Regions:
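A mature extracytoplasmic/lumenal domain signature
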Residues: 46, 55, 64, 73-77, ...
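Extracytoplasmic/secreted envelope proteins and their assembly/folding machinery
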Residues: 28, 161, 165-168, 194, ...
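Periplasmic OmpA-like peptidoglycan-binding domain that tethers envelope proteins to the cell wall
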Residues: 182-252
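Periplasmic peptidoglycan-binding/tethering modules of Gram-negative envelope proteins
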Residues: 92-178, 211, 252
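Central antiparallel beta-sheet cores of small beta-barrel/beta-sandwich binding domains
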Residues: 24-96, 101-104
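Bacterial N-terminal signal peptides
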Residues: 8-17
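Sec/Tat signal peptide C-region and signal peptidase I cleavage site
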Residues: 17-23
Length: 252
């Protein structure tokens, strides 16, 4: 079955459940969004979350950012080796593991849909690896919400980053491939400080690709954009969570 969506950006903001701590949250399982016909399998390890919908046509990946789960959604149809049919960014703000009640917005059409995601089962099925290389080659950009920085810091949290391992492996396999690493912040605080921070974060991602995963530094550029290129409204908490990102862009 083929799922066809035309989505430029999505926001999914969920209500908080105050008696459940963030440390207890794990969204691993099979989910049914009210407004979709396909079921979604999500898997969580630490703060990283990834999964798919349907027959692995629609993919999700991201990470908890405070009390919000920022996810990228792609419908690049890996099995059919097709180009991207949908891209989106979700912000989930929820501390329940059975019902996520919220709203998602299609910015290309202006349509807003409300309704819950219900977890049908804590079983996500067989483990699958997220196809980062396919997304980069067919979509052109990886918004790396899996890479976490403390507020105001340019130090990558954690010690292993599957998304960077996949990008480095792709660079080794494709000798003609070059990439740009672009850092972005939200608009909170001083513009000059945000610009400098975005540059340092982009440089940190490049450094991790080179020193940990053996990528060729000559084929990677890094640049910071500060708050100049938001993808959502900086006037909202959800929008700011999506705007804080590092992107890996296929340069050729």
């Amino acid at each position: 079955m083929t799922y066809r969506y035309v989505i430029a950006a999505m926001v999914l903001a969920f209500s908080l459940v105050p008696d459940v701590s963030l440390a207890q949250v794990n969204v691993t399982g099979t989910w049914q969004p009210k407004n979709w016909t396909l079921r979604i399998s999500l898997r969580q390890e630490g703060t990283r979350v990834w999964g798919f919908g349907g027959q692995q046509d629609f993919w999700f990946r991201g990470q908890w950012d405070g009390d919000r789960l920022v996810l990228v959604a792609n419908n690049f149809q890996e099995k059919r080796k097709n180009t991207c049919k949908a891209r989106g960014v979700f912000t989930l703000s929820g501390k329940t593991v059975s019902l996520l009640d919220g709203v998602w917005f299609q910015s290309d059409t202006g349509r807003t849909l409300k309704g819950p995601w219900v977890r049908l089962s804590p079983d996500a099925g067989a483990a699958v690896q997220y196809p980062y290389a396919t997304e980069l080659m067919y979509c052109g950009t990886l918004q790396t919400y899996e890479l976490a920085f403390a507020s105001g810091s340019d130090v990558l949290q954690g010690t292993d980053w599957p998304i960077l391992a996949a990008v480095a492996d792709l660079l080794k396999k494709d000798g003609a491939l070059t990439i740009d690493v672009a850092g972005h912040t939200d608009s909170t605080g001083d513009a000059k400080a945000n610009q400098a921070l975005s540059e340092r974060r982009a440089a940190a991602v490049k450094q991790a690709l080179v020193t940990k995963y053996g990528a060729d530094p000559a084929r990677i550029t890094s640049k910071g954009w500060g708050a100049e290129q938001p993808i959502q409204d900086n006037g909202t908490v959800d929008g700011r969570a999506m705007n804080r990102r590092v992107e890996i862009v296929r340069a050729r």
